Amino acid sequence: LNLSSNEIMLRIYDFLQAPGNWSLSADQVSSEFGMSTKTLVRLFQKETGMTFHQWATQVKLVLAMAWLSDGMSITQVAHQLSYSSDSAFIAQFKRYFAVTPGEFVKQAYC
């Protein structure tokens, strides 16, 4: 099957959206799609300007924002996205968005 880079990226994005797949490594995803890790990493860099890890983290945090906006608790979000702890999730969220998840929720509802 000859797919364009864009089609492959869409399939990978859909795959990573499935519950339980948010924390897969580049090695695991490349294996799932029958390509080398090096090829996957190059594809992500070319298509997004980010590393696979940066992109996957961004996808997780955008999901987190949506879930927090829908009323899911910080603990539930951290667990759903396979963070090792609430504090690990909070720290990463703050690194990306410059606010904690709790501050984000307060701002969203003010």
List each language-model region with its residue ranges.
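Short, Lys/Arg-enriched, Trp-marked, Pro/Gly-tolerant hinge/linker segments that flank
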Residues: L1-F33, K46-Q54, Q58
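Short hydrophobic/aromatic patch on the recognition helix
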Residues: L40, F44, A88-F89, F93
